[in-house]
Amino acid sequence: MAEELTPENPAIPETPEETEEPIKQRKNGLYPGVSDELAENMQSGWADTELHDLEPIAQAAETAARRAALSARFPGERLVIPAGNLKTRSNDTEYSFRASVEYAYLTGNQTEDGVLVMEPEGDGHAATIYLLPRSDRENGEFWLDGQGELWVGRRHSLAEAGELYGIPASDVRELAGSLREATGPVRVVRGFDAGIEAALTDKVTAERDEELRVFLSEARLVKDEFEIGELQKAVDSTVRGFEDVVKVLDRAEATSERYIEGTFFLRARVEGNDVGYGSICAAGPHACTLHWVRNDGPVRSGDLLLLDAGVETHTYYTADVTRTLPISGTYSELQKKIYDAVYDAQEAGIAAVRPGAKYRDFHDASQRVLAERLVEWGLVEGPVERVLELGLQRRWTLHGTGHMLGMDVHDCAAARVESYVDGTLEPGMVLTVEPGLYFQADDLTVPEEYRGIGVRIEDDILVTADGNRNLSAGLPRRSDEVEEWMAALKG
C-alpha cells in the first residue's frame, strides 16, 4: 500500500478563498514539501475526461417509483437520506464502504458522503442527489489528499451522476449550510452521517425520523421484479460458491475452516460485490454456535460442516443459504437421523409459505416437526403440545425459523411488528426458511453420541401468486441427494 504524498507543511495555499476544504495531512511523509513549481505543474496538462450520453442504471425506473411512493407518504416535508461516511479500520486505512440501504434503495448510488434530499415541490417532491464532485486540480486535492482521485480512483462528475441515476446532482459540500438555513418540516434517516444530523439538530425529532425509517423498511417487504432478479443472481452465485467449497474440502482438512471461508469469498468477489454477511464455516461442534464466524477451527473427516453463506450482488442484494454437509461425503447413521428431522421440518415450513398465510405459520410448522422428533427420541417429555406451549424444544432449536431477505440479510428490520412477524404473506415477499437442531458439546441432557452435532438447512423462498418458489432449489437438500451431489463434484 503506497504512502500518501501529502506533506506536513505543503506549499500549496490552503486559505478559505482558495480551497473549500483543507487537504488532509499525513505525518511522517517522505517528501519535505511541495515546491511552487511542482504545484503549478500538477495543475495543468490533464485531458478532459468528461463522459457523455451515459446509460442510466438498470434500476432507474424502480428507484424513481420508490421515491414517488416516499413522496406520497410524506407530502410537504423535506426528506434527507444520507449514504454514510467511510469508517476507519485502523490509523489511515478504512473499511470497504457500503452505503446505507435506505439511500441505495432510493437512488442506486453507492458513493460515500452522498445524500439524497427530497424537497417539497407542488404536490410532490424534487429529488437531488448531493455528491462530492471531481477532484479539484487547482488546490492539489486530487493528488495530495489520500481520498483524491489519483489515490482512490476517478469520481463521476455531477453531470455524469445525474445521467446515471436520473436525479439532478449537486455539490455535497454546499448541503450542510443550506440545511441549517432551511425552514419547514424535515425528516432524516439517522445513524449514517453525523455532519448532516448536526446541521438538522434543531429541526428534527427522533419520533418523526423513526417514522421515515419504518416506512422505508416496510416499503422493502414486497420486492419488485428487479429485486427478485437480483436475489436470484445472488442465490445462483451462492450455489456456485457452495460447489467450490465441496471441491476443496480435502484442502480444508489440511488447513482449517479459513480455507472454506476464503474459497467462498473468492466466488463472492468474482461474481458479486462481497459476501452479504460474515460467512459461517462451522465444522464439527462449531456447528452448534449459531453465528460461528471465527472460522479458525479444524475440518475433520467424519464431522459435519455447517456452511451458512451468501453472495451479495453489485446492487447489494444478498442470498442467505445454509447446508450441513458430511465432510467425508457420507452422513453417519445418527447424523442422517438428525439431518432428516431438520429436512422434514424445513419441508413443513416451506409448505406453509403462501399468499394469505400468516408470517408466523412457517415457523410454527417447522417447530412442530422438530418438537415431535425430540419427543420421539426421548430427549424431552411430551406430549408435543406441552413442549410447544412451554417452548421446551428451544433448548435445541434455539432460533426463529426465518426472516425477510433483501438488501440486508435480515431485511426490513425496522418494520412494525404488525407488518412483519404478525403480518400476512404477500406475493413478492422473499424470506428464509431455516430450521435447525443443535446439540451442544457440553449438553448433559442428551446422549453422548448427540453432543457436538449441529444441523441447519436454509433456503430463500419467494412468495408467488399461487404458493412459493425456492430460489435456492439448485442446491440439493435431501440427505441422499446431498451425498450424490458431493460425490459428483469430488469426481
Curated annotation (Swiss-Prot):
The EC designation for this entry is: 3.4.11.9
GO molecular function of the protein, one example?
Answer: metalloaminopeptidase activity
The top EC class, named as a word, is hydrolase
Q: How is the cofactor bound?
A: Binds 2 manganese ions per subunit.
Q: State the Pfam families in the record.
A: AMP_N, Peptidase_M24
Q: Which residues bind Mn(2+) 2?
A: 308, 320, 458
- Protease as UniProt keyword: yes
CDD domains in the cross-refs: Prolidase
Question: Does this UniProt record's set of keywords contain Flavoprotein?
Answer: no
- Miscellaneous comment in the UniProt entry for this protein: S.lividans has two genes (pepP1 and pepP2) which encode aminopeptidase P.
Q: Which family does the entry's similarity section mention?
A: Belongs to the peptidase M24B family.
Oligomeric form and interacting partners: Homodimer.
Question: What protein does this entry describe?
Answer: Xaa-Pro aminopeptidase 1
